[in-house]
Swiss-Prot record:
This is Fatty acid hydroxylase domain-containing protein 2. The keyword Transmembrane applies. Disulfide bonds: none annotated. Residues 176-299 form the Fatty acid hydroxylase domain. The lineage of its organism: Eukaryota, Metazoa, Chordata, Craniata, Vertebrata. It is a multi-pass membrane protein. One of its GO terms (molecular function) is oxidoreductase activity. GO terms for biological process: lipid biosynthetic process; positive regulation of megakaryocyte differentiation; positive regulation of protein phosphorylation. The chain crosses the membrane at residues 29-49, 77-97, 134-154, 168-188, 215-235, 237-257. Its main location: cytoplasm. Keywords: Cytoplasm, Membrane, Transmembrane, Transmembrane helix. It comes from Macaca fascicularis. GO terms for cellular component: cytoplasm; membrane. The keyword Cell division does not apply.
Length: 333
């Protein structure tokens, strides 16, 4: 009996071990296959992008050299065009389209994607004019002088108007570093501005809009504009000694992203603005850009318990998330 019991126990143990090893092999196979598929996909994507970059690189290099010839001896003018005028053109072009919807409610199909339903329908014209004046002041009297002072530092560090354009892989590396630096500097400067000492006199101005619109992304006290808007974006290119082409693309991208974060519409195929929109609604959650530091510091715990968190995804269809994931009746009231 003891022998049979021991034999059965041994068989059972062998079966369990076999099951465990089988599970481990299946897991390893699935993970390995997934990893290989991801690497193959990523290599394919980067190969096609690099091929496109390389094929068009000759064209852009020729155009860049033509610009250098045109502005020879006056590269600082070229720098100001690329670092200020082009990003501002992107900012106002995009916000011009959004302002049409904000002020008229048309086209109707875009209004369906509004995050805070019933707010800014239409936007208060007096409040809007005041905000636009502040944004223009910040751009002309704060951003422009900061870029003026930035140029000699970049010139000393690596010459932003050097003849050779950056490679595709180098620009991707720069973009990753710019994003990381912006996340760190913006998160901590933003949290600092929420300290009672600074909030009432400085940051409260930006939070006048509890339901934000795109153009108010730069609506802020001048001190906040320097510390929390400009510095997080400028430090990256300064550290990397970046080329003007990288600076132009980064500044333009940063302005478009912050506009989307404040626009008040969760539009298809664009980054989700739910995270920062919730910050304007509640004030004490979601301080960062990417949400990484909010996760580490626990400043997104309330957000994760809301419908807004469920909606914080890339919308890949045309059905508004307010319809597919409706708010609870309590909030709708």
């Amino acid at each position: 009996m003891k022998g049979e019991a021991g034999h059965m126990l041994h068989n059972e143990k062998s079966k369990q071990e076999g099951y465990i090893w089988g599970s481990m092999r299946r897991t390893a196979f699935i993970l390995g296959s997934g990893l290989l598929s991801f690497v193959a996909f990523w290599n394919s994507v980067t190969w096609h992008l690099q091929r496109f970059w390389g094929a068009s690189g000759y064209f852009w290099q020729a155009q860049w050299e033509r610009l250098l010839t045109t502005f020879e001896g006056k590269e600082w003018i070229l720098f100001f065009i690329g670092a200020i005028q082009v990003p501002c053109l992107f900012f106002w072009s995009f916000n011009g389209l959004l302002l049409v919807v904000d002020t008229t409610g048309k086209p109707n199909f875009i209004s369906r994607y509004r995050i805070q339903v019933g707010k800014n329908e239409p936007v208060d014209p007096v409040k809007l004019r005041q905000s636009i004046r502040t944004v223009l002041f910040n751009q002309c009297m704060v951003s422009f002088p900061m870029v003026v002072f930035l140029y000699p530092f970049l010139k000393w560090w690596g010459d932003p108007c050097r003849r050779e354009l950056p490679t595709f892989h180098w620009f991707l590396l720069e973009l990753a570093i710019f994003t990381l630096i912006e996340e760190v500097l913006f998160y901590y400067s933003h949290r600092l501005l929420h300290h009672p000492t600074f909030y009432k006199k400085i940051h409260k101005k930006h939070h006048e809009w509890t339901a934000p619109i795109g153009v108010i992304s730069l609506y802020a006290h001048p001190i906040e504009h320097v510390v929390s808007n400009m510095l997080p974006a400028i430090v990256g290119p300064l550290v990397m000694g970046s080329h003007l082409s990288s600076i132009t693309m980064w500044f333009s991208l940063a302005l478009i992203i912050t506009t989307i974060s404040h626009c008040g519409y969760h539009l298809p195929f664009l980054p989700s603005p739910e995270f920062h929109d919730y910050h304007h609604l509640k004030f004490n959650q979601c301080y960062g850009v990417l949400g990484v530091l909010d996760h580490l510091h626990g400043t997104d715990t309330m957000f994760k318990q809301t419908k807004a968190y469920e909606k914080h995804v890339l919308l890949l269809g045309f059905t508004p998330l307010s319809e597919s994931i409706p708010d609870s009746p309590k909030r709708m009231q």
